[in-house]
């Protein structure tokens, strides 16, 4: 795909992944703990990276409540080398919800982006059992997946 435009919204049984511009700025601001001006600047910067195909960031909304629960996606994307780093930011969610989101991110990296090498930095908001169940292996502070 020549642009990332078709990569939104993404749906899982319980979550909707969409561009941060599709959410109310106040909701995003509450999660980032920044004022509205700083948040707007940050959202614009993330969208510039998305349009440049160097990153891909979605707001993640709980579908049942329409509540923004965090954001995640990919950074350090190099589509020619088929490498990138995935992340999930926001408050810690229950393990089953973490699993649904992480599985979607890993599958997206493999199937849609065609990555051969994916990293995820260890985080206190993600359970290690969730990461292992998604097929990631821990190497120090970084979790890693590699196509064989």
Each model region followed by its residue ranges:
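Conserved acetyl-CoA pyrophosphate-binding loop and the N-cap/start of the following alpha-helix
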Residues: 96-105
């Amino acid at each position: 795909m020549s642009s990332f435009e078709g990569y939104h919204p993404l749906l899982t049984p319980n979550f909707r992944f969409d561009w941060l511009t599709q959410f109310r700025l106040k909701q995003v601001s509450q999660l980032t703990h920044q004022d509205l001006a700083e948040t707007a600047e940050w959202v614009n910067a993330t969208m510039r990276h998305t349009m440049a195909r160097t990153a891909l960031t979605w707001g993640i909304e709980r579908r049942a409540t329409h509540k923004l629960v965090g954001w995640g996606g990919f950074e350090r994307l190099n589509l020619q080398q088929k490498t990138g780093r995935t992340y999930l930011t926001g408050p810690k969610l229950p393990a089953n919800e973490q699993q649904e989101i992480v599985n979607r991110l890993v599958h997206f990296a493999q199937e849609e982006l065609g990555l051969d090498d994916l990293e995820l930095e260890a985080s206190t908001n993600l359970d290690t059992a969730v990461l292992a169940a998604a097929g990631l292996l821990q190497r120090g502070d970084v979790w890693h997946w590699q196509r064989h």
